[in-house]
Amino acid sequence: MVLMIVSGRSGSGKSVALRALEDMGFYCVDNLPVVLLPELARTLSERQISAAVSIDVRNMPESPEVFEQAMNNLPDAFSPQLLFLDADRNTLIRRYSDTRRLHPLSSKNLSLESAIDEENDLLEPLRSRADLIVDTSEMSVHELAEMLRTRLLGKRERELTMVFESFGFKHGIPIDADYVFDVRFLPNPHWDPKLRPMTGLDKPVAAFLDRHTEVHNFIYQTRSYLELWLPMLETNNRSYLTVAIGCTGGKHRSVYIAEQLADYFRSRGKNVQSRHRTLEKRKS
């Protein structure tokens, strides 16, 4: 059984995530004090029910040791996973402005900007041990729920999921990435007027990139690097490995390379997902 702990900065989508998990059959509890986690897990273990619990800055323990002790006291029947939701500062400010809700730390007479920054510092112990960090800055409510359903229902328990995502540097580097590879030095289909409207998912763009030796070399060396360290990452009790591939706009080169790497590791029997940030943004 899974004990999914949902945390993250206020306004990043914890309530949405908890509702999505409830739809997936999890027994959900909002804002449970950390010290009560073992007791809840023992109660649910008798009923063979997976659980999801949200923890925010209001019920954070005073020291990380309290959280570690609670994790160590969980029944063996439960496999704990920590999901951390985040968004960039400007997005959080905009969301609070749209909803006109008060930030949980506003009672300390802090400005909204200062409350967001302080919350980030207070939640760092949880963020640093998260199994999965999700950046919701560019996601709608429905996109976040669907992404969680895909990632959580599409993976086998305790198996590392490799996530290959493309992005454009001009839109910013994904904060959920474990590895970031820059492919802006590779030949750019953008300068071919016929290829410019297309994406890295289209065959003419793929054929253009496939003609260049340096593209093949990059794919080979990148997958070799990942293959070298993958066994150690798998034995390190990780649930996800997110590899971000970036080009200038996130439309051609990064999309093609991310798909090539995803196809390669998928053919090797790995649990693989792919995502293209710029293309998803264009659809929304």
Curated annotation (Swiss-Prot):
InterPro entries: P-loop_NTPase, RapZ-like, RapZ-like_N, RapZ_C. ATP binds at G8, R9, S10, G11, S12, G13, K14, S15. GO terms for molecular function: ATP binding; GTP binding; RNA binding. Residues 266-284 are annotated as: RNA-binding. Transmembrane segments: none annotated. SUPFAM superfamilies: P-loop containing nucleoside triphosphate hydrolases (SSF52540). Keywords: ATP-binding, GTP-binding, Nucleotide-binding, RNA-binding. GTP binds at D56, V57, R58, N59. Coiled coil: none annotated. It comes from the Bacteria. Homotrimer. Modulates the synthesis of GlmS, by affecting the processing and stability of the regulatory small RNA GlmZ. When glucosamine-6-phosphate (GlcN6P) concentrations are high in the cell, RapZ binds GlmZ and targets it to cleavage by RNase E. Consequently, GlmZ is inactivated and unable to activate GlmS synthesis. Under low GlcN6P concentrations, RapZ is sequestered and inactivated by an other regulatory small RNA, GlmY, preventing GlmZ degradation and leading to synthesis of GlmS. Belongs to the RapZ-like family. RapZ subfamily. This is RNase adapter protein RapZ. It comes from Cronobacter sakazakii (strain ATCC BAA-894).
